[in-house]
Amino acid sequence: MRKLLWKIPRDYYRCNQCFGFTLIPKLSPEELNELYSDYYLEDSSNMEAFTDGCSDNWIKKYKLTINYFRTQKLDSKNFLDFGCGVDGYGLQVAKENGLTVSGLEVSAKTRAILRANTNCRIFSPDELQVSSELFDFILLSDVLEHATSPSLILEQAIQHLAENGVLLIQGPLEGTNNFTNLFLRIYSYLTPAKVADFLPYHVSLANQKSIQSLLKTNGLKIEKIRITETWWPAPKTLSSFRALPKVLPQIIAKLLDFSVSYLLPNYGSRFWLVASKNSK
């Protein structure tokens, strides 16, 4: 994969066992605080815009979770959105399905916005750490790819999972073998002098094998898993015709990925799963 330059040169290294990728050198706590600043807070403090924006977006992003909730008895069950983000979609989905809802968020500003917009209890990491409360459902939606240690995140979540509770986990499979990543590897090979300068929000790039290995290592068993294809990260619009030579191969690669995903059920760049504690 292409070298990334953010403050210092960094590379994504592949694990020889699970074939997932990790960004090395890892981000320091100070760099993480800088990275996740007010960027995620733009246009999210307006209650009317927040409410209007949720309806369509949460249905698209949380369709599988919504369908899963419809098969469960949710009376008197509680729910924790572990790393809910400023949009609060996961909180809204759980509230719509009658669950008693709480969230966890690192940023104090984000917590304040979420409390105002959702009327939910939002923990800070320190508050959750000292809490003895257990949850029937814990959601990690697009969280693990941001973590320098996904295993540590899972450990923290499991500490607050009820005995018969389940984890609902979803996110991208950026380390999978597909046409999109093949195009990116070829492009990197043909342009070795170029260095990526995007902000490293995603530092752990998973594939299906690495996700399964991560859960097994942390004493979890997968009850359900769905692999799907999404348009991301291919561009949705063309900024200029000069960009066409680069954009067109990406679009073609993504169309090929969609075509294969219709034929192979475990082919795709996004996962959703339900996991529980392994009693064995």
Where are these regions (language model features)?
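Generic low-complexity, intrinsically disordered sequence content enriched
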Residues: Y68, K95, G165, N218-G219
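S-adenosyl-L-methionine-dependent methyltransferase catalytic module, highlighting the catalytic core
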Residues: L140, T148-Q159, V166-S276
